[in-house]
Amino acid sequence: MAEKSYKYRIYPNKKQQELIRKTFGCTRYVYNYYLDKRKKLYETDKTTYTYVKCAKDLTQLKKEFEWLKEVDSVGLQTSLKDLDVAYKNFFSGSAGYPKFKSRKNRHQSYRTSFTNNNITFMDRHIKLPKLGLVKVRDKQVPQGRILNATISQEPDGRFYCSLCCTDVSFVQLSKTNQFVGIDLGLVDFAIFSDGIKIENPRFFEKSEKKLAKLQRDLSRKSIGSNRWDKARVKVAKLQKHISN
């Protein structure tokens, strides 16, 4: 048994998109708010708030800012857990001091945990807290038990949902005790020791040239204009294609 993640492209309606973006903002606000409080305390006497302390304080913060109640409460709690992990990594010496999250980051996301069957994969839909049923095209049903879901938006505007599952069974392949050597090159993509050759389709070179042209077009547009935004999305989509 092991853990496995399943990433789906989701197609939220306009109301769901608005709520997703609002959740991005609220989880980012909570993270930055308590990072600021912990930062000031650390600068004063080299101590910090615990996760439990922040979680209790969040209840009062939601009374002060009613709009925090409009989004998934588990998502807000998860942002506190992420901050707590960031501090533990800092104090253990494995990472630098936690940084504030920026709304200008073109990749936005939040994570929510499975509880009381609040995350379910149904026929071409994923049920998510506060969002309800969100459309997906992929028919692949996640195996095992769902632990959490990460909802994200890429720079090209597309939305995704990644389901992290545990207790996933894998088929153990039988050993063949056969070996093959692979030589990767520029002229031929790969040459196997048994004589098989795979030609280099040069997709990367073609995509790189196309990307350079799109980036030149983007640089000529007025920043913030509709044409600039359309050109930016084209660049982001091609960058996503190249990275895949």
Residue ranges, per PLM feature:
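Nucleic-acid substrate recognition interfaces
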Residues: M1-N244
